[in-house]
């Protein structure tokens, strides 16, 4: 079974159509990269997968989004959905609290209070985000004292702490230096063993490095999607080729 199936998805902001008849499948334990010029619908699309667009006034959505075969707009509670489908944003956004409390925040909201259980979740999540060794002696320091790259990995650990199945990443390295970017890319490769990952990126080389599948968006349309090697080296649509070779962007 596909992890996510999207069928005939349309989205309007008021009268403006931002997504047009999107049809796309996401394989389990894979990395799907979404590429395309600014304003093409990539970020709007991933926000339909955890219903973040519900928070915007005047949004109208039609079509179907299935997670494990269930319609997320009809059959799934939105709080449960956002536990299953985590999100990492473009700019690191740690909460103004300790490193420990950042990671424990989600589990506490979901009712976990036992100190030993929380300790285990915090350690496991920080290890999974490749951050434990750097912060294990600073767990009770402010998260805002970490570097930008560490803060982004902390946000990933915070996402992992509620045990999602899918991780959405909206340009997670665009605000980071090259070394921090490399660490996040290595982390993505490791995380896909356990999670399904969808990443929005403006960086074509990054899409080529980290993804198994690539989807090219343009003006709210999904022009083409498929295995990354095919989309990059043997695209079916001239617009895909023009974008990838830098003729526009």
Curated annotation (Swiss-Prot):
It is a peripheral membrane protein. Gene3D superfamilies: P-loop containing nucleotide triphosphate hydrolases. The keyword DNA repair does not apply. InterPro entries: AAA+_ATPase, ABC_transporter-like_ATP-bd, ABC_transporter-like_CS, P-loop_NTPase, PstB-like. It is an enzyme of class 7 (translocase). It comes from the Bacteria. GO terms for cellular component: plasma membrane. Its EC number is 7.3.2.1. The keyword Ribonucleoprotein does not apply. Keywords: ATP-binding, Cell membrane, Membrane, Nucleotide-binding, Phosphate transport, Translocase, Transport. Part of the ABC transporter complex PstSACB involved in phosphate import. Responsible for energy coupling to the transport system. This is Phosphate import ATP-binding protein PstB 2. It comes from Caldanaerobacter subterraneus subsp. tengcongensis (strain DSM 15242 / JCM 11007 / NBRC 100824 / MB4) (Thermoanaerobacter tengcongensis). The lineage of its organism: Bacteria, Bacillati, Bacillota, Clostridia, Thermoanaerobacterales.
